[in-house]
């Protein structure tokens, strides 16, 4: 299975900064050992599209609505992402769930809509620290996958990104043993649902100094990287493991 190295820039980088970043990154991208995907903020999607023309580097949106257009103030259109040449949409990130109240039913609608446009949804799942310490990790991930993929087409691509919420932007990293155990659980859940070919990415304070050890764990098919993807050299090192 091919590796995928995805960068979630969240609400960072202006269009100007986006162009400057790709001017640097394209010189380093040849070292990547898998597919590279960037999720810039909505305001920088067009800059990413222009910068990445003629390259094999993919890009997508951090969120979308489950309709192409309409009276949905503040939402993003996956159709526009497609028109710009994008390939992916990030769906169900823990910040969308926690800050904006997105539930599994809405996530499922978005996954199905994105697939219907011929784009690839990258479905984010993960447990909180309280859920892990209460031994509820498996149940939480099983529920998120069951409900989030409820309307998904098994014949079309989908990528799953496991991000323990307690390790996002905190500097805390799941141990290789925790990653191995949880990714094996996620694979088994996906297999039972008929999505055994879906790549499973790990996210949660991934950095150049821990990426090589994490990528060796079973069913880790790449990374979804936050802060460490904002610097070209740092992310290129991660994408080359």
Curated annotation (Swiss-Prot):
<keyword id="KW-0324">Glycolysis</keyword>
<keyword id="KW-0312">Gluconeogenesis</keyword>
<comment type="similarity">
    <text>Belongs to the triosephosphate isomerase family.</text>
</comment>
<dbReference type="GO" id="GO:0046166">
    <property type="term" value="P:glyceraldehyde-3-phosphate biosynthetic process"/>
</dbReference>
<feature type="active site" description="Electrophile">
    <location>
        <position position="93"/>
    </location>
</feature>
<keyword id="KW-0413">Isomerase</keyword>
<dbReference type="InterPro" id="IPR035990">
    <property type="entry name" value="TIM_sf"/>
</dbReference>
<dbReference type="InterPro" id="IPR022896">
    <property type="entry name" value="TrioseP_Isoase_bac/euk"/>
</dbReference>
<dbReference type="InterPro" id="IPR020861">
    <property type="entry name" value="Triosephosphate_isomerase_AS"/>
</dbReference>
<feature type="binding site">
    <location>
        <position position="169"/>
    </location>
    <ligand>
        <name>substrate</name>
    </ligand>
</feature>
<feature type="binding site">
    <location>
        <begin position="8"/>
        <end position="10"/>
    </location>
    <ligand>
        <name>substrate</name>
    </ligand>
</feature>
<comment type="pathway">
    <text>Carbohydrate biosynthesis; gluconeogenesis.</text>
</comment>
<dbReference type="GO" id="GO:0006094">
    <property type="term" value="P:gluconeogenesis"/>
</dbReference>
<dbReference type="GO" id="GO:0019563">
    <property type="term" value="P:glycerol catabolic process"/>
</dbReference>
<comment type="subunit">
    <text>Homodimer.</text>
</comment>
<dbReference type="GO" id="GO:0004807">
    <property type="term" value="F:triose-phosphate isomerase activity"/>
</dbReference>
<dbReference type="GO" id="GO:0005829">
    <property type="term" value="C:cytosol"/>
</dbReference>
<keyword id="KW-0963">Cytoplasm</keyword>
<dbReference type="InterPro" id="IPR013785">
    <property type="entry name" value="Aldolase_TIM"/>
</dbReference>
<dbReference type="InterPro" id="IPR000652">
    <property type="entry name" value="Triosephosphate_isomerase"/>
</dbReference>
<dbReference type="Pfam" id="PF00121">
    <property type="entry name" value="TIM"/>
</dbReference>
<feature type="active site" description="Proton acceptor">
    <location>
        <position position="163"/>
    </location>
</feature>
<comment type="pathway">
    <text>Carbohydrate degradation; glycolysis; D-glyceraldehyde 3-phosphate from glycerone phosphate: step 1/1.</text>
</comment>
<comment type="function">
    <text>Involved in the gluconeogenesis. Catalyzes stereospecifically the conversion of dihydroxyacetone phosphate (DHAP) to D-glyceraldehyde-3-phosphate (G3P).</text>
</comment>
<dbReference type="GO" id="GO:0006096">
    <property type="term" value="P:glycolytic process"/>
</dbReference>
<feature type="binding site">
    <location>
        <position position="205"/>
    </location>
    <ligand>
        <name>substrate</name>
    </ligand>
</feature>
<protein>
    <recommendedName>
        <fullName>Triosephosphate isomerase</fullName>
        <ecNumber>5.3.1.1</ecNumber>
    </recommendedName>
</protein>
<feature type="binding site">
    <location>
        <begin position="226"/>
        <end position="227"/>
    </location>
    <ligand>
        <name>substrate</name>
    </ligand>
</feature>
